[in-house]
Amino acid sequence: MNRFGTRLVGATATSSPPPKARSNENLDKIDMSLDDIIKLNRKEGKKQNFPRLNRRLLQQSGAQQFRMRVRWGIQQNSGFGKTSLNRRGRVMPGKRRPNGVITGLAARKTTGIRKGISPMNRPPLSDKNIEQYFPVLKRKANLLRQNEGQRKPVAVLKRPSQLSRKNNIPANFTRSGNKLNHQKDTRQATFLFRRGLKVQAQLNTEQLLDDVVAKRTRQWRTSTTNGGILTVSIDNPGAVQCPVTQKPRLTRTAVPSFLTKREQSDVKKVPKGVPLQFDINSVGKQTGMTLNERFGILKEQRATLTYNKGGSRFVTVG
């Protein structure tokens, strides 16, 4: 019993620190400032929470050390720009980004430029050194050259510089150059005419006449029906063709129709109305009869006429 009791007393004595040491620590903390006390408490807390690493842990492989660090929440090599270890313990290359992460278009621009050379000392761009500084531009230039070599030459209509505009005309949609130029001239004329400038149209009447003749002449046509009728059109050069009259271009605005004076016709138009069979003025002058009395007499005469004829379909209501 005594041995067992002595053992217990020894165990308790070794496990708990002496009270004198604790009192000394408390006295030291009283003399210290508040910031120093906070720092000291943090250090003590870190020492208590930090796991004790044995030699066995140091002899473990990289994967086992990685698992232990994940379990205990230890971050090793957490400094900026240091080489970090992956799961198998191999060194991973770290990127130094002191000014923050550069993404997007700025990252593309900076990757092509050589580091360490200021733009003042950099030689001017040429075909030789463009690949060193801007490899992306070099690739684009090569692709453009390949595409230009593969393209076929397309016939381009020559037009005056003033009227040259971008027209999205498909390749298979062919039109005569004369028509295009004529349309351009008319557009230009209307543009200037709206701003009060006089325009003299220069039209090739002979060319327009040739175009009209070419439209009228048709080639041989065979009907698609089952009948045996053949339609043929033959040119007759002896026939007189009516010359195409060109309307002169107006240099002033046309007068609207409602402002023009209408020509007064000599023939008087008979007004539409009901024939009264007598002159109202003469009746009023000759007799003292009113219009109501006169119309009443006419109604009675009409009623007697219809009654004498016999039966009629119409009935007059007085």
From Swiss-Prot:
Which cell locations does it reside in?
A: Nucleus, Nucleoplasm; Nucleus speckle
Which portions of the sequence form the region Disordered?
1-25, 79-100
GO BP, one annotated term = mRNA export from nucleus
List where the motif UAP56-binding motif lies.
26-44
Care to name a GO molecular-function term for this sequence?
RNA binding
Q: Where is this cross-link: Glycyl lysine isopeptide (Lys-Gly) (interchain with G-Cter in SUMO1)?
A: K140
* Superkingdom of the organism of origin: Eukaryota
Cite the record's Basic residues compositional bias ranges.
85-98
Key words of the record? Acetylation, Isopeptide bond, mRNA transport, Nucleus, Phosphoprotein, RNA-binding, Transport, Ubl conjugation
**In terms of one coarse class, where is the protein primarily found?**
nucleus
Q: Which residues carry this modification: Phosphothreonine?
A: T14
UniProt crosslink position (Glycyl lysine isopeptide (Lys-Gly) (interchain with G-Cter in SUMO2)): K261
Pfam families, sorted: FYTT
On this chain, the residues bearing N-acetylmethionine are M1
Query: Can you tell me which family this protein belongs to?
Result: Belongs to the UIF family.
Stated role: Required for mRNA export from the nucleus to the cytoplasm. Acts as an adapter that uses the DDX39B/UAP56-NFX1 pathway to ensure efficient mRNA export and delivering to the nuclear pore. Associates with spliced and unspliced mRNAs simultaneously with ALYREF/THOC4.
* PANTHER family, per database record: 40-2-3 PROTEIN-RELATED, UAP56-INTERACTING FACTOR
Its protein name is: UAP56-interacting factor
What organism does this protein naturally occur in?
Homo sapiens (Human)
> What gene, per UniProt, encodes this protein?
FYTTD1
